[in-house]
């Protein structure tokens, strides 16, 4: 007897993913937005619909088979859409919420699963593609008036990250391949805004010994203005990740 995927008669909302892509630039947190080419137009987060196949394809996918036109998971959908619409291929995505209010999309009932990710300019060269007319980086406090409920998604992502601010290894994705402690400290401190200030002396004590084995003589790609005093120690990002046990 052949196996078949079960079918049901109740209505099914479409499933989508949206990605909050963040960087630190010139002392502020910025979010990547795309200008939608399709209706409803406006600025929005990169994202799109989960691609599914027919019963046979989905049955095979449930058994581990892959198909070029089917998303094997929600994360696969988020990665594909971010790549197609903005040309960004993040190292890691973090799922933080789902959105399905009846009034969130004028086209119908859609459920979106939201992710956030950190990037650095060195590893991120956005370009508009597929459904996007253009893209821009916008300060997170000015990411307002976006399409759908994306204002709320951006705010929720920011809150979620701030709740995880003690997981120091998460913030390494904001750094270039070679970085200094002051570069990391300044980026990390931005996510403490509105809370008590980060204890910089404790932070330095925590990472100084842990990162010692990752010191490098490789020059910074963008040195910036020369600071007074001894040059800051430089660290190799991948070595720091390994020392801190950051997940790949």
Regions found by a protein language model. Name each.
Residues 6-31:
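Conserved N-terminal beta-strand and adjoining loop/helix that marks the start
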Residues 10, 99-111:
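Acidic pyrophosphate-coordinating catalytic loop
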Residues 28-88, 167-180, 185-189:
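Conserved Nudix-box catalytic region and its N-terminal flanking loop in Nudix hydrolases
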Residues 31, 35-43, 47, 54-55, ...:
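Short, His- and charge-rich active-site/binding loops that engage polyanionic ligands
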Residues 89-97, 197-201:
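A short coil-to-beta-strand element that immediately follows conserved catalytic motifs
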Residues 114-117, 125-165, 174-187, 202-210, ...:
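NUDIX/MutT-family hydrolases
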Residues 196-219:
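Charge-enriched amphipathic alpha-helical scaffolds
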Residues 215-248:
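Long, intrinsically disordered, low-complexity Ser/Thr/Pro-rich regulatory/activation regions
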């Amino acid at each position: 007897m052949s196996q078949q995927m079960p079918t049901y008669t109740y209505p099914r909302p479409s499933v989508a993913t949206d990605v909050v892509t963040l960087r630190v630039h010139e002392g502020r947190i910025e979010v990547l937005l795309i200008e939608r080419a399709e209706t409803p137009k406006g600025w929005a987060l990169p994202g799109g619909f989960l691609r599914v196949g027919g019963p046979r394809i989905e049955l095979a996918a449930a058994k581990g088979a892959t198909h070029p036109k089917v998303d094997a998971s929600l994360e696969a959908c988020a990665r594909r859409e971010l790549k197609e619409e903005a040309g960004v291929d993040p190292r890691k995505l973090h799922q933080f919420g789902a959105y399905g209010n009846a009034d969130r999309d004028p086209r119908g009932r859609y459920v979106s699963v939201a992710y956030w990710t950190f990037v650095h300019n060195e590893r991120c060269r956005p370009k508009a593609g597929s459904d996007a007319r253009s893209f821009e980086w916008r300060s997170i406090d000015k990411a307002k008036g976006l399409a759908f409920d994306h204002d709320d998604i951006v705010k929720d992502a920011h809150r979620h990250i701030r709740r995880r601010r003690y997981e120091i290894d998460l913030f390494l994705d904001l750094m270039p391949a070679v970085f200094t402690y002051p570069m990391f400290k300044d980026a990390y401190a931005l996510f403490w805004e509105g809370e008590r200030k980060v204890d910089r002396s404790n932070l330095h004590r925590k990472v100084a010994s842990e990162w010692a084995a990752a010191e490098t003589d490789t020059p910074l790609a963008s040195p910036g203005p020369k600071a007074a005093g001894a040059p800051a120690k430089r660290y190799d990002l991948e070595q720091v990740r390994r020392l801190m046990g950051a997940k790949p």
